[in-house]
Amino acid sequence: MAQFRVTKRSMTKDIKPVHVIGAGMAGSEAAWQLAQAGVPVVLHEMRPLVKTDAHHTDGFAELVCSNSFRSDDHELNAVGLLHEEMRRAGSLLMEAAAVARVPAGGALAVDRDNFSNYVTEKLTAHPLVTVERGEIDGLPPADWDNAIIATGPLTSDALGKAIGELTGADELAFFDAIAPIVYRDSIDMSVCWFQSRYDKESAGSTAGAGGAGKDYINCPMTREQYEAFIDALLTGDKTEFKEWEKDTPYFDGCLPIEVMAERGPETLRFGPMKPVGLTNPHAPDVKAYAIVQLRQDNALGTLYNMVGFQTKLKHGEQTRVFRTIPGLEKAEFARLGGLHRNTFINSPKLLDPVMRLAKEPRLRFAGQITGVEGYVESGAMGLLAGRFAAAERLGRLPQTPPRTTALGALLAHITGDADATTFQPMNVNFGLFPPPEVPLDENGKRPRGKAKAPARKRAYTSRALADLEAWLRPRAEAAE
């Protein structure tokens, strides 16, 4: 077991370790929060001894889908607010994202290898963290009186079965999809061009290869090219589902592109291939019927991922179909798309307000297995689980964040606000927050027209950050 420092909290008393199962986004963040609070942690990760269908490394917090954490705007966007709340709460994931950041307009995107390496190095170097490699193939032993299960969308079959038997509830499953990655130098820039939608610049100090406001590579399509592409998507050979994967619903936030196309021929043109906010410098007077965007995937700018192009097409079909896109005729793929299954528990039915299993409170769940959707949301639930477990170990009552914060709104959703009979994965959004009081404008009137929506969003976010600071303050004072 790792040696740990004597702190004001522990005085000279030994503190039993908390066991964290899974070193993904949630588990890594939970372990960090515990260790930073002065609580020893045993972090269990089955990779590389037991592999998954989606992971490629044995690193912690490996990103297996997109490399984007979505919008970083903490004034007008709910996930951007969640970023900021996590930063203020001392998040390791947000620290790593700042180090590994790559250009992505107003989004927070990272070099996935640099990100994972940073998280792995920080945790393995922490004196209060012990890493144990190997599968936990059943429920945690009875002498683990405080354990966090953060095994994510690819929970091993053995552990998943044990959880199902314990909860007595049917697990739900769906698929997250992986988008292809293209080598930058194989893209024909005489056809494509660099531009962020509406020329929006990166939120940080980074800029894409094309310069400020030019973080994406855009591939234009005529109507004829778009319709031919849709036909190719619909008729292309797909990887067959295994028997245990059949009848599994998809989550709308990560639908395979061919599934979107099946919903109607115009669906993609009003989704990831929408042509708005972009002007082709090669033909400025010609409006594209549809546009495919590629986003920088690594710090060097040598890899670009196809935005929204998660797919279950067979690999040979992917190269054939995607090379019909103008500018990608000679594209070389660093990685082709694929799908992996995701499982989650019925959290509103099973968990208490501090994420413990009501039936067996020594077990706490965190991350995507709780039914949150997205890297940041998973990490956020890991942050809370770690803080709650640390409070218990240090003899304090866990304090939940205010529901007016992004952390609190998401937590409340999965631990009771959502309808357990129809519970489905959820991203953070302002619809989870209590409605705010929108301040009057300089004329003493309620904002109207175009000013109404941003004023309301700022009311959400300003209230959230003020309430977050009040929630964080007692812990900061206790640490002094």
Swiss-Prot record:
It comes from the Bacteria. GO terms for biological process: tRNA methylation; tRNA wobble uridine modification. It catalyses: uridine(54) in tRNA + (6R)-5,10-methylene-5,6,7,8-tetrahydrofolate + NADH + H(+) = 5-methyluridine(54) in tRNA + (6S)-5,6,7,8-tetrahydrofolate + NAD(+); uridine(54) in tRNA + (6R)-5,10-methylene-5,6,7,8-tetrahydrofolate + NADPH + H(+) = 5-methyluridine(54) in tRNA + (6S)-5,6,7,8-tetrahydrofolate + NADP(+). Gene3D superfamilies: FAD/NAD(P)-binding domain (3.50.50.60). Its main location: cytoplasm. NCBIfam families: gid_trmFO, PRK05335.1. This is Methylenetetrahydrofolate--tRNA-(uracil-5-)-methyltransferase TrmFO. It comes from Parvibaculum lavamentivorans (strain DS-1 / DSM 13023 / NCIMB 13966). The gene is trmFO.
